[in-house]
Regions:
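N-terminal secretory targeting modules
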Residues: 1-75, 80-81, 85, 90, ...
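Catalytic His-Asp segment of secreted/periplasmic serine-dependent ester chemistry enzymes
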Residues: 26, 170-254
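Structural recognition of the beta-strand scaffold that forms the well-ordered cores
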Residues: 71-76, 96-100, 124-129, 164-168, ...
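Oxyanion-hole/transition-state-stabilizing segment in secreted/luminal serine hydrolases
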Residues: 80-97, 101, 107-147, 170-176
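A short acidic, glycine-rich active-site loop
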Residues: 98-104, 183-188
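Charged helix-capping and loop-helix junction motifs
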Residues: 142-151, 185-191
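Surface-exposed amphipathic alpha-helices with a cationic face
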Residues: 154-158
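Helix C-cap/helix->beta junction micro-motif
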Residues: 159-161, 201-202
Length: 254
């Protein structure tokens, strides 16, 4: 009975989703090709909400870490996924893996943590997420829920001997497009404070990207693509901070 109810709810949701997209086509003039692309994206999201297949083939082909190599997984949302994409390389020569998925909340990250971090034999993980929770993308977003998800990921990591680095969310600004309506700056600041406190209480390394990218409360315009994502200059600021945090985390393990 419960399964039938769940299936019925999913069907109703899908119908509502399709209806909303069809309405969008009539109201915004989407072409048939654009509509099909959007429907396919929504259908994929319904099939694989947590992105379990996103890195499936890459993970399967990944060799074991070289002897003495400290594999580190950068685990997060679009801030992580976009890192190194334009240049086609991610920390060349370093045993670092990018396992970011754009648009994900920490709830989705938690579901795929085992296959995208633990199963890859990581020595350390940088957990970077929360901005999409604040924007309430796909899951309800509260500071408490983000912390619960980060705690759960940390517990899984510790149980598998993986050092944890908790990263701040990055700032936003309305310098290109409106970002602060969905991601109020005060909420981002509050979440960062909670993440910092959690890291301190738990003996974890806190990686403060936010402080290096912000001017007042705004993302520095020269360091962002659209007020949300860092540009190449922004990632250049973030890279040494991440490297320093990795050294600190791995030193704690020795």
């Amino acid at each position: 009975m419960a399964v039938r109810r769940s299936a019925a709810c999913a069907a109703v949701f899908l119908v509502a989703l399709v209806a909303s997209v069809l309405f969008a086509q009539t109201s915004s003039g989407l072409s048939a090709a654009e509509l099909e692309q959007r429907l396919n994206a929504y259908a994929h999201l319904l099939r694989d909400w947590a992105g379990l297949t996103r890195y499936g083939s890459e993970n399967a082909e990944l060799p074991a870490p070289a002897a003495g190599a400290d594999r580190v997984v950068f685990f997060g949302d679009q801030i992580t996924e976009a890192w190194g994409r334009s240049a086609g390389r991610f920390f060349p020569g370093k045993p670092y893996l990018n396992r970011g998925i754009a648009g994900q909340t920490t709830a989705q990250m938690l579901v795929r943590f085992r296959q995208d971090v633990v199963a890859l034999h990581a020595k350390a993980v940088i957990i970077q997420g929360g901005t999409n929770d604040i924007a309430s993308l796909f899951t309800p977003g509260t500071e408490a829920l983000v912390l619960d998800n980060v705690r759960s990921m940390t517990e899984i990591a510790k149980a598998n001997g993986i050092r944890v680095i908790v990263a701040s969310v990055t700032p936003v600004c309305d310098c290109v497009t409106d970002q602060t309506t969905t991601r109020p700056q005060g909420k981002l600041i509050g979440l960062n404070g909670a993440l910092r406190d959690y890291a301190a209480e738990s003996g974890l390394v806190f990686l403060n990207y936010y402080a290096a990218l912000v001017n007042g409360r705004d993302f520095k315009p020269e360091l962002t693509v659209d007020g949300l994502l860092p540009n190449d200059a922004g990632y250049a600021v973030m890279a040494p901070l991440a490297e320093e945090a990795i050294v600190r985390a791995l030193d704690k393990a020795r």
